[in-house]
Amino acid sequence: MDFFEDNNPFSGSDNRSASSAVNVEPKVEPSQHQGSSSVKENAISQPNESFQSRNMFFQKDVDSVVDSALDPNGIVITGAMKAESGSHIVYIIKLQDSEIHHRYSEFASLRVQLSRLYPTCLVPPLPDKHKIMDYLINVTKNQRMSRMLEERKRLLQLFLRRVAQHPILGLSEVFRKFLSRHVSWKEVLHSPPISCLPKDLLKAPPADPSSKENAELYKELPIPSKTLVPRDNYDDVGKNFLMLEDTLQQYSIVAQEESNLFNQIVLSNSKYCLAHSTLGAMFNALSLSESGKLLTALEKVGQANDHTCLASIDFMHNFVIAVIEPLQELSKDAKNMRHIFIFRKMKFIQQVMVEELLTRKKSFLHLLERRERHAARLQQAIGEVDGDVILNRESEATLGVNNAQTSRSTIPEEDPLFNDEESKEPSVPLMGTDQPLENYHDGNGEQTEECLRDLRHNQSQDFETVSQDTSLTSVTVLPRTIRDVFDRIRFVLNGLTDNNVEVSRHNNIGRTAESVTHLTDMLLITTKDVAFVTDRVNFEFQRYQDTHRQDLNRILNRLTDSHIDWANRNLRIWNSVQESLKTYVS
């Protein structure tokens, strides 16, 4: 956090008198402010005491701070001082009988962590690290640093008091540890609940972002976009929040512009003060050359100009504290409240996204189930058709056997091999012993095989002749070769994967059903979160409105009081001058 570091106003100056003008208190020993607690610390620092007892004492001190009710008015920042190690500035916080030292970067870190721990709570703003007004006014570096430290002490004290007044932030364990002198802030940052916070608050329960309950479901929640859902698709509550968000944005801009205008008034008054200071010096110089009543009158006019200058300086100081700084606080509060509305909008969009995902998954699951039923009906119908085909094939096979037997009995009369000429040959007698009949069948088989061989040889010769005559042989063979290669690759890939269509379909249905169950649980938690965030935002906005009315009323009253006081002071001075002039004229 280097960008939070403080600039040390004492690092570039060795002038003791100048540094003493910065209202920086000297370092005070803890024994001067802690009363009876110093006895405990001396007992703890004894070398014979164990480390365990020391830790028990520290934990007891932390628990007492956490359990005790904080008085917001009891939190006071008494001063600023240079840190023992380093060149940064630490601010001294006095709470009851203890003192705590924290630097500006730790205040900024506290605010960031409170915003993360309580995303639906309005965390008070911090003063700006640097302001342009500090450099526009022609003052020295020490005067600028003195003014900056005074302003920071005042606004940091206001920040702590506002946090303590909050009904939720004031009871935060992190805030109580920040106000404990025995707890290191670095240890707090690296310990629960801060160490358990996720990177994105949209993936955590808004009631307790550090909770691990339903952590797996929250991790899988989608991250929405601000413009994902059109304005017309919001419900009445969402449209009301959108209107309030736009109103707060405009109000923040207007409050910032008013603050800038008041800063211009301060600059004009600074010139006005300088002019009256110059006039006072000139009238005082003129009075030196006069005497009598004229001398008195000139001195009165010069003193009136000097008093006008002083009254204007006091007016500007009160004006900055009572008007400009509260207006800047109001502008920052409006921005922070708008961010809370944006957080609620993002949670609502997240719920809409989960609903859409669940609807698509349910539709896809219904489609898969319908396909599964259709496939089951087809499989049943195919089974019935296969049964009929098997019966028909069995009947045809039975008829084929009977026909074969019948044809086999009539072969001697119909077979062309048994022609008239061969039947008359004496070497193949139709009747006689078995040996001539076996020789006949052997001869007939050899003739049939020889005919088949001649037929195959002729077909192969015809195919080779056609292949040699055509000119598209390479074109027809190459695609078949490539197709064979891809068929083999596809066969290997199908062997590596689950190529069972039925099993794949069942697995897909199972995965989709599991996703539907998962999304249903996510929808339940997002719906619950949106309801919680809506209630908390309504409560916080109501509290913001009440505080805003009080602050704005106080600003207007202080503004009028400052003008009236400035005018009354000037009126008294110039009335006395008028009386002196009447005496001189008479």
Curated annotation (Swiss-Prot):
Function: May be required for cytoplasm to vacuole transport (Cvt) and pexophagy. Has a role in meiosis.
Listed Gene3D superfamilies: Arfaptin homology (AH) domain/BAR domain, Phox-like domain
Main subcellular location of this protein, as a coarse class: cytoplasm
GO MF annotation list: phosphatidylinositol-3-phosphate binding
Keywords from the UniProt entry: Autophagy, Cytoplasm, Endosome, Lipid-binding, Meiosis, Membrane, Phosphoprotein, Protein transport, Transport
Positions contributing to a 1,2-diacyl-sn-glycero-3-phospho-(1D-myo-inositol-3-phosphate) binding: 103, 105, 129, 152
Residue ranges occupied by any PX domain in the UniProt entry: 69-185
Compartment annotation: Cytoplasm; Endosome membrane; Endomembrane system
Protein name: Sorting nexin-41
Polar residues composition-biased segments: 8-22, 31-46, 401-410
InterPro entries in the cross-refs: AH/BAR_dom_sf, PX_dom, PX_dom_sf, PX_Snx41/Atg20, Sorting_Nexin_Autophagy
One of the Pfam families matching this protein, by short name: PX
A single BP term in Gene Ontology: reticulophagy
Highest taxon of the lineage: Eukaryota
Record comment regarding domains: The PX domain binds phosphatidylinositol 3-phosphate which is necessary for peripheral membrane localization to the perivacuolar punctate structures.
Membrane topology per record: Peripheral membrane protein
Cellular component annotations (GO), alphabetically ordered: cytosol; endosome; endosome membrane; phagophore assembly site
Segments of skewed composition (Acidic residues): 412-423
Phosphoserine carried by residues: 19
Family of the protein in this entry: Belongs to the sorting nexin family.
